[in-house]
C-alpha cells in the first residue's frame, strides 16, 4: 500500500502542470521561481543548507534549474526519541506562552497562548536527591540527602585508567542520531516537501521504520510515508511529511505574523512603544517566527478553516514575512512535527 501511495505521489508531481502564478499571500502556496528565491535566501542566511542536484539529467525536473533541484543539510543532531520518556520530560518542563510574549519574561496582553514543552530545564529548580552508599564490604548504608556542594567534581579526578569503556556498545545503544534533511518542491501541492534520512551514532543508516520514532504521533500515523527520494538513482527509503496540509498551515502562520506586525506598528504610531523596540532585519524575522502559534495553525488546517484577518491592504514593505523568507517559516512548522530533531542547529546565523 505504501509503495502504491509513493508511486501515485511521484506521478502527480512529475506530470502535474506547473503554475507560475504567484498566490503566496492568498493561499500559502508558492511557484517554482519563489521556491528558488526562498532557497537562495535560506542558503545565504544559513550556510549549513545548500542546493543539491539530481544524480542524472534524466532525474531533474524542468521547472527548476540544474544544480538547484532540492535543498539539503547534513548531520542534524537528534538526541532523544518521542516516546514516554520524551513526553514525561516535556510534562515536567512546560510553560504557557502568551501571544505577544517577548520570551524574556515579559507577558503579552493576550490571555490565549500555546503550550511550549521541553527546553526549560534551566528554569527548573534542582531537586535534592536521596542516595545510598555502599562500603568496601558491600553493605548498603541508610538513605541520606546529598547537597550539591558534597558531590565530587569528576573533572577533579585523574583516575582515567579505572574507567572501563565499551565504545561499541555505546554507539549501538546511544540515543544520539543524526539526520540529513532534504527539501524538494511539489508541483501538485505547490509547497515544499521535507524528506528525512537518519543515521545511528556509529554512522550506520537508520532503518526507515525507526525514523518514525522521531516524528510526532499525529503526523506519524496520518501524513508521514516512507518513500524513495526522486532525485537519487538508488532507491533510498526516507521518511517524508506529506504536504497535503502545508499550504493552509503556512497561510495561517503568515496571516498571524502580518496581524502581529500591524498591531505592533499601531502601538508605535500611538506612542505606546519606542521605535527601538521594533526589531528589524534577521533579528526581527527570528523574533516573528519564534512567536508563531504552529499548533493553532495546524488545528485550523485540520478543520479546513481559514484564518480571518483584517482585510487591510498590505504591500511588500508592510508584510511580516516575505516570500523569499518562506522556507524559514516552513522549517519552523517542520520543527513542530519532529521536535526531537534540532532544526535550530541548521539555522545558526
Curated annotation (Swiss-Prot):
Function: E2 conjugating enzyme required for the cytoplasm to vacuole transport (Cvt) and autophagy. Required for selective autophagic degradation of the nucleus (nucleophagy) as well as for mitophagy which contributes to regulate mitochondrial quantity and quality by eliminating the mitochondria to a basal level to fulfill cellular energy requirements and preventing excess ROS production. Responsible for the E2-like covalent binding of phosphatidylethanolamine to the C-terminal Gly of ATG8.
Active site positions, chain numbering: 244 (glycyl thioester intermediate)
Protein's organism: Gibberella zeae (strain ATCC MYA-4620 / CBS 123657 / FGSC 9075 / NRRL 31084 / PH-1)
Subcellular location per the Swiss-Prot or TrEMBL entry: Cytoplasm
Protein name per the record: Autophagy-related protein 3
Keywords, comma-separated and alphabetical: Autophagy, Cytoplasm, Protein transport, Transport, Ubl conjugation pathway
PANTHER family for this protein: UBIQUITIN-LIKE-CONJUGATING ENZYME ATG3 (PTHR12866:SF2)
Keyword Nucleotidyltransferase: no
Any GO molecular function: Atg8-family ligase activity
UniProt KW Transport keyword: yes
Ranges for region Flexible region: 95-173
InterPro entries found in the cross-reference section: Atg3/Atg10
One Gene Ontology term from the biological process aspect of the record: autophagy of mitochondrion
Free-text comment about domains: The N-terminal region is involved in phosphatidylethanolamine-binding and is required for ATG8-PE conjugation.
UniProt subunit comment: Monomer. Interacts with ATG8 through an intermediate thioester bond between Cys-244 and the C-terminal Gly of ATG8. Interacts with the C-terminal region of the E1-like ATG7 enzyme. Also interacts with the ATG12-ATG5 conjugate.
Residue numbers covered by motif ATG8 interaction motif (AIM): 306-309
Amino acid at each position: 500500500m505504501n509503495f502504491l501511495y509513493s508511486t501515485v505521489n511521484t506521478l502527480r508531481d512529475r506530470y502535474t502542470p506547473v503554475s507560475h502564478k504567484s498566490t503566496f499571500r492568498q493561499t500559502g502556496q508558492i511557484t517554482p521561481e519563489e521556491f528558488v528565491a526562498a532557497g537562495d535566501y535560506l542558503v545565504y542566511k544559513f550556510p549549513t543548507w545548500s542546493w543539491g542536484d539530481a544524480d542524472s539529467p534524466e532525474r531533474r525536473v524542468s521547472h527548476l534549474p540544474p544544480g538547484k533541484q532540492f535543498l539539503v543539510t547534513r548531520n542534524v543532531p537528534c538526541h532523544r526519541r518521542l516516546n514516554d520518556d520524551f513526553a514525561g520530560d516535556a510534562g515536567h518542563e512546560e510553560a504557557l506562552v502568551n501571544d505577544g510574549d517577548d520570551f524574556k519574561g515579559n507577558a503579552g496582553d493576550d490571555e490565549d497562548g500555546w503550550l511550549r514543552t521541553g527546553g526549560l530545564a534551566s528554569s527548573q529548580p534542582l531537586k535534592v536527591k536521596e542516595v545510598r552508599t555502599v562500603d568496601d564490604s558491600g553493605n548498603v548504608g541508610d538513605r541520606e540527602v546529598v547537597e550539591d556542594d558534597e558531590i565530587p567534581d569528576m573533572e577533579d579526578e585523574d583516575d582515567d585508567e579505572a574507567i572501563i569503556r565499551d565504545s561499541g556498545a555505546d554507539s549501538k545503544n546511544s540515543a544520539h542520531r543524526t539526520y540529513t534533511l532534504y527539501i524538494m518542491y511539489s508541483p501538485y501541492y505547490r509547497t515544499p516537501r521535507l524528506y528525512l534520512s537518519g543515521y545511528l551514532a556509529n554512522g550506520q543508516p537508520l532503518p526507515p521504520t525507526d525514523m518514525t520514532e522521531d516524528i510526532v504521533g499525529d503526523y506519524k500515523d496520518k501524513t508521514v510515508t516512507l518513500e524513495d527520494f526522486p532525485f537519487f538513482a538508488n532507491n533510498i527509503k526516507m521518511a517524508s511529511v506529506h504536504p497535503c496540509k502545508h499550504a493552509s498551515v503556512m497561510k495561517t502562520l503568515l496571516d498571524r505574523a502580518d496581524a502581529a506586525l500591524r498591531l505592533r506598528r499601531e502601538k508605535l504610531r500611538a506612542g505606546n512603544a519606542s521605535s527601538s523596540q521594533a526589531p528589524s532585519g534577521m533579528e526581527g524575522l527570528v523574533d516573528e517566527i519564534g512567536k508563531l502559534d504552529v499548533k493553532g495553525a495546524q488545528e485550523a488546517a485540520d478543520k479546513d478553516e481559514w484564518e480571518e484577518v483584517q482585510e487591510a491592504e498590505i504591500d511588500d514593505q508592510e508584510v511580516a514575512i516575505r516570500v523569499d523568507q518562506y522556507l524559514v517559516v516552513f522549517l519552523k512548522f517542520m520543527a513542530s512535527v519532529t521536535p526531537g530533531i534540532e532544526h535550530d542547529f541548521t539555522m545558526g546565523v
